[in-house]
A protein has these predicted regions:
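Charge-rich, low-complexity N-terminal segments
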Residues: 1-49, 55-121
Length: 121
């Protein structure tokens, strides 16, 4: 992965996270915005596509609803990114669920249960 790809990924991740925190995306499915986490961004080699990985940190929001809201607002998000970032061509945004945080928490829960039962030393 090139240095430029990494820089573009980080810029897109940071800007989308800021949009969510500032409430710039006026969709009730994204509220509270602090519960929506942009866990990562991956851009294609030609910078034409950016995969944005999203996780929901609370039970009050449904992951599918959040993804639907982001997909339906992808055009607005892309336009706002175009205004803020100095890129020749703004990548197409594709939002995907990132369940790594949820899976990690589940592994921790299982390990804790095993420690409590004495099966894990």
């Amino acid at each position: 992965m090139s240095r430029r790809q990494q820089r573009v990924e980080e810029l897109i991740r940071r800007e989308i996270a800021q949009m969510l925190l500032r409430g710039e995306l006026r969709d009730p499915r994204l509220s509270p915005a602090s519960a929506v986490s942009i866990t990562g961004v991956g851009v294609s080699g030609d910078l034409s596509v950016a995969r944005v990985y999203v996780d929901v940190l609370t039970e009050s929001l449904r992951r599918d609803d959040v993804l639907d809201a982001l997909v339906s607002g992808a055009g607005v998000i892309r336009t706002k990114l175009g205004e803020r970032l100095q890129l020749r061509r703004m990548p197409e945004l594709r939002f995907e669920a990132d369940q790594s945080i949820t899976r990690g928490a589940r592994v921790e829960e299982i390990l804790s249960e095993l420690r409590d039962s004495g099966e894990l030393e």
